[in-house]
């Protein structure tokens, strides 16, 4: 997840993060980034991954959503195959996801192998509510990035 935060562009990342293909287009909503105080060990997360039951997001639909600035399609297809494994190791991730969904964010997911979570909404209200449901003492980072 580092390359697209550095470049501020959406990207499809493969391999060990070393193959970066930027996606054309943008989604014009701000992105809330939340990092719990606790973390995850990437090696452990991958060791818990159930490869027989692995789902992958439809990257074609995600790329088209960015190209067309189609928030609803993006919301229906964003996924992270590592989330279930990471939650087994770190329940703070699930708590953060649940709190952000309760605020009304349509897209809530984990970045990379965790424990950072991102949230995006097509409405303004969730961006006002999150401050009430996230205790700053439990998080290293709570930041809004303008858009991707």
PLM regions with names:
Residues 1:
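Conserved AMP-binding
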Residues 116-121:
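Short, amphipathic C-terminal "tail helix"
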């Amino acid at each position: 997840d580092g390359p697209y935060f550095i470049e501020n562009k959406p990207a499809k990342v493969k391999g060990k993060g070393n193959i970066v293909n930027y996606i054309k287009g943008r989604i014009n909503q701000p992105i809330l980034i939340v990092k719990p105080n606790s973390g995850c060990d990437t090696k452990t997360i991958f060791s818990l991954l159930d490869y027989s039951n692995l789902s992958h997001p439809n990257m074609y639909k995600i790329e088209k959503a960015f190209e067309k600035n189609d928030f609803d399609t993006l919301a229906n297809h964003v996924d992270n195959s590592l989330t279930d494994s990471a939650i087994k190791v770190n329940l703070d991730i699930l708590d953060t996801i649940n709190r952000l969904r309760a605020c009304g964010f349509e897209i809530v997911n984990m970045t990379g192998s965790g424990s950072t979570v991102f949230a995006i909404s097509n409405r303004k209200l969730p961006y006002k509510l999150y401050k009430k449901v996230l205790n700053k003492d439990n998080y290293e980072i709570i930041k809004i990035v303008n858009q991707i």
